[in-house]
Amino acid sequence: GREWAQETKESAVEFVREGGGMVLVHAANNAFRNWDAYNEMIGLGWRAANFGDCIKWEVLRNRPFVTCFDCTSGHGSRHPFQVAVRAPDHPIMKDVPATWMHGKDELYHNMRGPAKNLTILSSAYSSKKQGGTGEHEPITYEVKYGKGRVIITTMGHFWNGQTDWDGLHCVGFQTILARSVEYAATGKVSLAVPPEFPGTDEVSFVEPHAVTWTKKTSNLPVQTTGKKKKEENPHAILTP
């Protein structure tokens, strides 16, 4: 897409820095490679070799580590893969099964960036048989930027001509995305993990129009709700 106007960029940075939240899905981390503040806000993205640090998850020591100094970001073939929670006490991951199967999707590898104030929330093994790296790659992660929160997930691929929606209709992806949005907006998560959530070895699909595990909404008028949210966060961008 087109580069954002400078005014738009500055507004976005101020919004997050002053306490706002932002959620990025899949290829959104490919964007704005030459925008320094954006790279800091997303922590890791699809970048060329030698750009920032390449961060992976070290399973034996249960921690992130820097590796692959000259590798370029990429992905192998689309396939189902098992996601492992790495920050079980984080609001987004609380009560999420330790491991769960995600529907057929692109598994990004060799994500690179400044990686400042970054917490890896989940990872997945990138199989060499599928064109991957043979290492655990970050899947969902958080970056603290100023007073704000940025959540990035590399799940959620869909392309023109694709005949399946597995990556988007996976209940695991839908749950993590919904919880990420709530967390980015409020700093908290009240949306429960649904009973349809995938198991360790089995994928679970629900089309968006059939989702039943939505958050109950307030009966307050829109104006009242908006005013309350604005008081809680004066930097919030609200729509009716």
Predicted region positions:
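Solvent-exposed loop/turn segments at secondary-structure junctions
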Residues: 1-3, 22, 28-32, 98-100, ...
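A glycine-rich, often tryptophan-bearing local segment used as a flexible ligand/cofactor-contacting loop or short
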Residues: 2-91
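Structural detector of well-ordered beta-strand residues that form the stable sheet scaffold
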Residues: 19-23, 121, 151
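Secondary-structure transition/capping residues
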Residues: 23, 49, 103, 191-192
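A short secondary-structure junction signal
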Residues: 34-36, 96, 163-164
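Oxidoreductase and adenylate-handling cofactor-binding alpha/beta cores
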Residues: 38-42, 98-104, 111-118, 156, ...
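Catalytic beta-strand/loop cores that center a nucleophilic Ser/Cys/Thr
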Residues: 44, 58-149, 208-226
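Extracellular ligand-binding/catalytic regions of CAZymes and related secreted enzymes
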Residues: 127-240
